[in-house]
């Protein structure tokens, strides 16, 4: 598959087909090509001998997609940066990435960034003044050059830039289109922010098949009336989200085939798909196919998939996450470094062309997590699991990294920033489960000196500081105050004891 050519052919074959819809804003495939060509031409003229990554800032605006393609046509990887990301984190991404340019689809509220900022109005001028110019196709990202870089949570308190190459993305997109039986011209739900790699599961499968991306933003999700009004208008056929989002939608009785009569495929990734959620979806959407998938950001969205049928639901209380895509393989490694036999638990290691080339500017972290096996890139996921007859079963994290509502995060990163807050002497983050998956974060805090008469005022002050350093989804929902943190005999935090205390 030639990814960019495959997207561009729709500008010729179906130029007036809508490529992307967000609220009242939409773009056609013709506009997508013209504007991304104009932007790529401008980037190449301004930065002729430069291939540094470009930050793309915004939320669900159509210009985000234009900017992504404009960057890669000019030979630059893009770094999606959502509006919700705190200023301090945006600053660290800018510094770590070496980006020189930020393209903005929304007002940039972050100050003192070490990059040139192209505003919304500047972008419109570029689209207009460079219209009709086409970039040199030889300049476009290709092969093992980075296509995008997504920053994920890092245990040192600094985010890690996962580098995904053109070849990685082609491998994923081709597999997704074929294995999920995606058809030409379908409407895809775009629910995940672009800084979250789940969004890649809908963006590129939609664009290469001439589909329409129907974007749901965070304000809609916070207002169910607006959300379901949008869904009713959408005629979505391919649903891509975390299981949590679908579970929330199922709380609305009208969320069914009557609301979305042409629903064909549910694609789930990012967290555990509960058996009962899949069962309800089959009841509400009897004609739709439900696919459960698995994969970390470092292996390009997902590398396994399984069609969840009623037979699968009856056979497995905890659902398997699927069979590996044909160009990759899974190894289950025991602690001694040997390969575990069928049915035995160990660390999931992914081998093949889906695997990232590593973390940008972080050779030590890259060496720790990535290796070569039989001449192919391999990623040590830190996930526990086992394989039985080719089917992968996921058993949670081996370390303190978790997925909460689809967002992957390092508990140590949150603890790092929490301990840096005023009024905090010590802190541990405890993820609280509801059934099979994590429901919320609890912060166990040893407070320092403070003058607050009520605990809720202390909590408000700590949360205010955290909001300046971490995304909202990493802020603990509840706080518990103790005089000390329990320790193990070897001097480490006794997390098991702490969990038993807080859940007793």
From Swiss-Prot:
Keywords: ATP-binding, Cytoplasm, Ligase, Nucleotide-binding. PROSITE patterns: AMP_BINDING. The lineage of its organism: Bacteria, Bacillati, Bacillota, Bacilli, Bacillales. ATP binds at residues 152-153, 292-297, 383, 394-397, 492. This is D-alanine--D-alanyl carrier protein ligase. D-alanine binds at residues 197, 301, 492. It is an enzyme of class 6 (ligase). NCBIfam families: AA-adenyl-dom (TIGR01733), D-ala-DACP-lig (TIGR01734), PRK04813.1 (NF003417). It comes from Bacillus thuringiensis (strain Al Hakam). It catalyses: holo-[D-alanyl-carrier protein] + D-alanine + ATP = D-alanyl-[D-alanyl-carrier protein] + AMP + diphosphate. Pathway: Cell wall biogenesis; lipoteichoic acid biosynthesis. It comes from the Bacteria.
């Amino acid at each position: 598959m030639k990814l960019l050519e495959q997207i561009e052919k729709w500008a010729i074959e179906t130029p007036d087909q809508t490529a992307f819809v967000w609220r009242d804003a939409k773009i056609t495939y013709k506009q997508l090509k013209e504007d991304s060509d104009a932007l790529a031409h401008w980037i190449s003229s301004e930065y002729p001998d430069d291939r540094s990554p470009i930050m793309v800032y915004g939320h669900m605006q159509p210009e985000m997609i234009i900017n992504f393609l404009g960057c890669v046509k000019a030979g630059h990887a893009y770094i999606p940066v959502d509006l919700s990301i705190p200023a301090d984190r945006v600053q660290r991404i800018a510094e770590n990435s070496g980006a020189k340019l930020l393209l903005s689809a929304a007002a940039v509220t972050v100050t003192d960034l070490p990059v040139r900022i192209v505003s919304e109005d500047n972008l419109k001028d570029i689209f207009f003044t460079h219209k009709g110019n086409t970039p040199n196709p030889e300049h476009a990202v290709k092969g093992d050059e980075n296509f995008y870089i997504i920053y994920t949570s890092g245990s040192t308190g600094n985010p890690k830039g996962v580098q995904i190459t053109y070849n990685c993305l082609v491998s994923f997109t081709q597999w997704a289109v074929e294995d999920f039986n995606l058809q030409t011209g379908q409407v895809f739900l775009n629910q995940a922010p672009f800084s979250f790699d789940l969004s890649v599961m809908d963006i590129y499968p939609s664009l290469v098949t001439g589909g329409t991306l129907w974007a749901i933003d965070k304000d809609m999700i916070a207002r169910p009336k607006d959300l379901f009004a949008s869904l009713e208008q959408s005629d979505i056929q391919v649903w891509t989200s975390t299981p949590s989002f679908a579970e929330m939608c199922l709380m609305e009785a009208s969320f069914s085939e009557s609301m979305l009569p042409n629903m064909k495929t549910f694609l789930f990734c990012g967290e555990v798909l509960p058996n009962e959620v899949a069962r309800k979806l089959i009841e509400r959407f009897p004609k739709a196919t439900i696919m459960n998938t698995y994969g970390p950001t470092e292996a390009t969205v997902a590398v396994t998939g399984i069609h969840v049928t009623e037979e699968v639901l009856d056979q497995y209380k905890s659902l398997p996450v699927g069979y590996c895509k044909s160009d990759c393989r899974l190894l289950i490694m025991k602690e001694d470094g040997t390969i575990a036999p069928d049915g035995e638990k160990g660390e999931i290691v992914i081998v093949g062309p889906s695997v990232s080339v590593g973390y940008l500017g972080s050779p030590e972290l890259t060496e720790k997590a990535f290796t070569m096996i039989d001449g192919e890139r391999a990623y040590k996921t830190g996930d526990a699991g086992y394989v039985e007859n080719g089917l992968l079963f996921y058993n949670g994290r081996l370390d303190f990294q978790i997925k909460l509502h689809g967002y992957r995060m390092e508990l140590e990163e949150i603890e790092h920033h929490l301990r840096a807050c005023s009024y905090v002497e010590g802190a541990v983050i405890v993820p609280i489960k509801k059934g099979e998956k994590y429901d919320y974060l609890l912060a166990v805090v040893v407070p320092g000196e403070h003058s607050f008469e009520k605990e809720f005022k202390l909590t408000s002050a700590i949360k205010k500081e955290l909001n300046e350093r971490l995304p909202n989804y990493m802020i603990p929902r509840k706080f518990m105050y103790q005089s000390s943190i329990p320790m193990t005999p070897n001097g480490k935090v006794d997390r098991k004891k702490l969990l038993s205390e807080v859940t007793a």
